[in-house]
Amino acid sequence: MQSLQELVSNMREHKGQWLHVVSGTVPVCKSGSKIHRLGELRLMSAQVYQIVDSFMNQGQKKKILLGEEVVTTVNVGENFQMRVHIYRQRGTLAFSGKLIPAKFATLMDLNFPEKLQRSFLKSNRGLILIAGSRDSGRTRTLNALLDAYAKQSSVHIVSLEDSIEGIFPRYDNSLISRRIYGFDVKDFESLEESLIKGDLNVLSVGEINNLDRLRLALNLSSRGILVIGTILGVDVEGVLMNLLKCFGGGLQFRMSVAEVLKGVYHRRTIQNLDGERYEIDESFVNYAPTRKHIRENHIQSIVSFMKTGGRSDCWDYSRSYQSLVDNGGLTVDEVPQKYR
């Protein structure tokens, strides 16, 4: 029987990032946009069950027996972990796994803009959103920010996560507590008061993918806590448009967002016609003029504010694309029409 470790070793030979195992098929890995078969042998449902059974705990096994999905993290070597999503298809088990470094990157490793780093790290309350599409490095950036806060100040950080990924180093003057949704955290109604009573300075809510997490983020940021979360979106404009529709999108809600939102950072990976990959970004930091735009739901006014470049920590993708064109990374024709 193939083990998860053997599958990971095979996928690393192809420089794969994603592993996909479906009962009755040959396992495959994905590297960039290419898919590679890992051998020729199909894995039957019993074999797939044995693989996932080898790394699940009893609680996770019960969820699978009840027909629920499971997300967990598995150590697959000294330097890597795999975030595994176990689900059912056609009545049998399947799973997808993403290979991630066990050691967290720093903001410097990620080339996080220094001008934005200064703006974010001087904040001690409010809401910061790290945005992007799937696989854009949102969680990696979030953890790098937490690491930076822990190094620069004496703070108590609580990180709420779907699964524990990576290992934070020890800090001389800071503490990071990590709690898992659905295991350590089950009741959102009591969670807010529990966190407030815990002498909390910084809270990571992980991915804001439901209204409970958004409500928690807004409530705690309004009570003097610095809250950081990740969110899906095509760009800053899209993130703000979707955010302001939540909870009915009324004036009272927009006023709350305008008051607590510190900024949105969005990053994406692009590829030119020669196959070369680049990471580009855009940033919005919420200043007094833009708070008014949020209250009035004037998103286009915020986009214009970013385009004008009146603030060094605010810029849009049109400037990032133009910088790539100027440096020879892209041709003008490769730039999406929206950003020309």
Residue ranges and their predicted role:
Residues 2-340:
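Short, flexible helix-loop junctions that flank or precede catalytic/ligand sites
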